[in-house]
Amino acid sequence: GQGETLEGNPDGKRPVVGGNTFVVVEAEGDDLVHSDGKTAAKACELLAEYAKRQKPFFLGVGFVRPHVPFVAPEKYYSPFLPYSKMKLPHKVEGDWDDIPKPGINYKTSVNMKMDVRRQKKAVGGYYASVSFMDAQVGKVLTALKKAGLEDDTIVIFTSDHGFHLGEHDFWAKVSLLDESSQV
């Protein structure tokens, strides 16, 4: 598929890398090519087995997305193309004036060297990753219903942190502002 490293790549020469960096990959293949697709499929399989047992069960289903790098099958990107239509948050002059220096997120548009085009692509990549993860959650909830377990099962959907998408000119999670700390 198509991929681009957005962070620290102002001249566009840096290759697509993995790890905890802003990369967008419009990946080839279907959901099952990706770990989250495989996780959802296995959870659905287990729910069908648990329904036959008619005993209490616990099933923890953890998805990677929408964590960076933003990787999802191409079909999840199409609603967010072209990236140029993505809206960026309004920048407030003096927004950091009341934040002590240690509280300034180290992931800013400036120090990540992300121009407006790359910022918009990051937003589109995040939205595509959320859409992909949402589809996987939908498969698990559908399997729960199909197994006849939905009325007797408690589903807890949570996350470990929020995520900045350019609000306050911050990106990722490392701040105490609402966008990062609330889930």
Q: Would you name each region that the model predicts?
A:
Residues 1-41, 45-56, 60-183:
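Active-site-proximal cap/lid insertion segments
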